[in-house]
């Protein structure tokens, strides 16, 4: 019996090295469409989480979004990407608060970006300034130990695509 649904509105960036994230094009769900989905889920008695998720238009997996650790003139920069990513996340944090959503998941499988601890801590603090519910982050399988800022979120999440025959062992790691 299901009682919780995660809705994942998408943002798009051209490549893994693009700094701008678009979440208002025809290729993304509109706010009105998302609000309709939230209302419908609540009518069914379900609790709702929003997981705004960025993807690359060229098909590169979002885990590979990556830039130089040091700013280099004429190269894409983490600071610009996180500025755009924060705008994207805060848009949905405000919508989540407006709609009475229970949880905001601040990212999904952003493996290369996870090392940017200061930026993630600031993002999560910014989300908390706009949203009163639970805040989570969803890392990729086998990457849980690399996230040094788990203490900043309320719920730890991992995309555990583990073999069924080894499920119990994977839960014990």
Regions found by a protein language model. Name each.
Residues 3-19, 32-113:
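Substrate-binding cleft and catalytic face of glycoside hydrolase catalytic domains
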Residues 17-26, 168-171:
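Short, flexible/disordered intra-domain loops and linkers
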Residues 23-24, 66-69, 123, 153-156:
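Short, hinge-like loop/turn segments at secondary-structure boundaries
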Residues 24-29, 80:
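Short coil/turn segments at secondary-structure boundaries
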Residues 29-31, 36-47, 51, 129, ...:
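Glycoside hydrolase catalytic-domain groove-lining segments
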Residues 57-59, 117, 167:
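Short, function-defining helix-loop hinge/capping sites that tune catalysis or transport
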Residues 64, 81-84, 123, 152-153, ...:
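Enriched - but not universal
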Residues 88, 98, 103, 114-137:
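Active-site neighborhood of glycoside hydrolase catalytic domains
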């Amino acid at each position: 019996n299901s009682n919780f649904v995660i809705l994942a509105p998408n943002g798009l960036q051209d490549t893994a090295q693009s700094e701008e994230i678009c979440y208002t094009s025809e290729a993304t769900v509109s706010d009105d469409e998302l609000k309709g989905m939230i209302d419908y889920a609540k009518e069914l008695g379900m609790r709702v989480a929003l997981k705004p998720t960025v993807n690359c238009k060229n098909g590169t997996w979002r885990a590979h979004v990556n830039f130089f650790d040091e700013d280099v003139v004429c190269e894409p920069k983490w600071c610009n990407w996180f500025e755009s990513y924060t705008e994207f996340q805060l848009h949905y944090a405000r919508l989540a608060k407006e709609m009475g959503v229970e949880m905001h998941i601040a990212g999904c499988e952003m493996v290369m970006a996870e090392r940017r601890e200061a930026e993630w801590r600031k993002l999560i603090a910014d989300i908390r300034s706009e949203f009163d519910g639970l805040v989570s982050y969803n890392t990729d399988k086998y990457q849980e130990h690399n996230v040094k800022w788990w203490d900043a979120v309320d719920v730890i999440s991992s995309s555990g695509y583990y073999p069924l025959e080894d499920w119990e062992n994977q839960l014990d790691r």
